[in-house]
């Protein structure tokens, strides 16, 4: 093989190696983009996730979020199951999925039930045979209403209502519903107080809170819920809403991830969620409510390994992560050096011929000298 062909072959190999290295570096340096299903767009969770997504970009995080709009937590979970999203904002009383693992507990909200005063409705059992107006995303409260009716043995009708004061007040004024049920974050207190006043004014009927007196027993039988209270004045207003504490149950909202997502990506995501919650709270106050998801084995959603690493403080340092490279790097460089020598020889580089001839001449002189000594 001529020297020109040898040089051409080596140049091609070097160019290929550089191209592969550049491609690998580009791929490794690009952030991981995770799709997250959340909605509706005008609800708090969508605003919070959007704010976090912008923060991840601004902070140069190795993980980014791409939002997949959904009609609510039920639809979001369905999208995760179908592979249309890698993350989803879901509720603890959803249908669940073996694919979903918890990243963080976003917030825990009280179940609020109200009914017009002087109608004899003081507890959920009084709603037997009556119509409940359910306010919220499509399908989000289906499991909740079904659980309550079964527990209190109070079958009846359900009517879905849009979360607008006009539609809600119209339903109350026309007696299309006997009570209202909704789940609302505590950070929406002022907004709820304003809506409450608007509904009361438009419907010309005073509303009262309905207590769930068997909340402890109900939560014990249904782990998706927790017993709790709506504290007096929790939703503001004048007079305070409510005027005294009301026993109820609470439902949790989680950020869950497909269990096949790498632990490193979820660890980075969890770190940002907690480190930046204060920065995001100005844009989305609900961000202040985020908590660590349960590490218990019987949790509604098992903890994702990546989130577990963050919560346990077991994130690896750069030395721990790249220690093997530092150990084996010199060996690899030595092997590359040996390979370079082979390439140089392949290209025709040899030891200097004059030097080689001189060494041969020295050996001949030594041999003649030795023969002369033997002859003597």
Label the predicted regions.
Residues 1-66, 81, 98-100, 104-108, ...:
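N-terminal hydrophobic or amphipathic helices and topogenic motifs
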Residues 69-73, 81-95, 165, 181-188, ...:
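Beta->alpha turn/N-cap motifs
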Residues 31-59, 110-111, 115-174:
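Bilobed "Venus flytrap"/periplasmic-binding protein-like clamshell domains
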Residues 118-125, 216, 261-264:
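Short helix-loop capping/hinge motifs at secondary-structure junctions, enriched
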Residues 31-33, 62, 75, 82-85, ...:
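Extracytoplasmic
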Residues 102-122, 211, 257:
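Hydrophobic/proline-rich hinge and linker segments of small-molecule sensing/allosteric domains
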Residues 224, 228-296:
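Secondary-structure end/capping motifs
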Residues 142, 156-250:
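Pocket-lining segment of extracytoplasmic ligand-binding domains
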């Amino acid at each position: 093989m001529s020297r020109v062909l040898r040089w051409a072959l080596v140049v091609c190999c070097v160019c290929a190696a550089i191209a592969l290295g550049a491609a690998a570096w580009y791929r490794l340096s690009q952030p991981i983009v995770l799709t997250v299903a959340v909605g509706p767009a005008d609800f708090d969770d969508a605003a919070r996730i959007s704010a976090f997504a912008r923060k991840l970009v601004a902070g140069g995080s190795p993980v980014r979020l791409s939002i997949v709009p959904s009609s609510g937590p039920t639809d979001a979970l369905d999208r995760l199951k179908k592979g249309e999203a890698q993350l989803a904002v879901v509720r603890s009383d959803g249908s669940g999925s073996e694919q979903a693992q918890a990243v963080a507990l976003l917030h825990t909200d009280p179940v609020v039930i109200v009914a017009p005063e002087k109608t004899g409705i003081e507890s959920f059992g009084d709603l037997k045979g009556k119509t409940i107006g359910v306010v919220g995303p499509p399908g989000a409260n289906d499991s909740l209403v079904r659980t309550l009716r079964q527990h209190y043995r109070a079958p009846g009708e359900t009517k879905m209502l849009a979360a607008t004061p006009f539609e809600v007040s119209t339903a109350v004024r026309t007696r299309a519903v006997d009570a209202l049920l909704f789940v609302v974050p505590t950070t929406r207190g002022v907004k709820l107080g304003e809506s409450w006043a608007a509904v009361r004014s438009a419907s010309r009927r005073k509303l009262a809170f309905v207590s769930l007196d068997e909340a402890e027993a109900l939560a014990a039988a249904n782990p998706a819920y927790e017993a709790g209270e709506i504290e007096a004045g929790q939703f503001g207003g004048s007079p305070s809403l409510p005027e005294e504490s009301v026993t109820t149950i609470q439902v949790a909202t989680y950020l869950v991830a497909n269990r096949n997502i790498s632990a490193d990506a979820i660890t980075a995501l969890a770190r940002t969620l907690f480190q930046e919650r204060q920065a995001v709270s100005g844009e989305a106050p609900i961000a202040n409510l985020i908590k660590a998801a349960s590490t218990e084995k019987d949790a509604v959603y098992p903890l994702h390994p990546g989130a577990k690493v963050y919560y346990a403080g077991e994130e690896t340092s750069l030395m721990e992560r790249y220690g093997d490279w530092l150990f084996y790097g010199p060996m690899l460089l030595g092997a590359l050096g040996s390979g370079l020598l082979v390439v140089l020889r392949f290209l025709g580089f040899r030891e200097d011929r004059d030097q080689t001839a001189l060494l041969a001449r020295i050996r001949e002189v030594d041999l003649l000298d030795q023969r002369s000594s033997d002859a003597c």
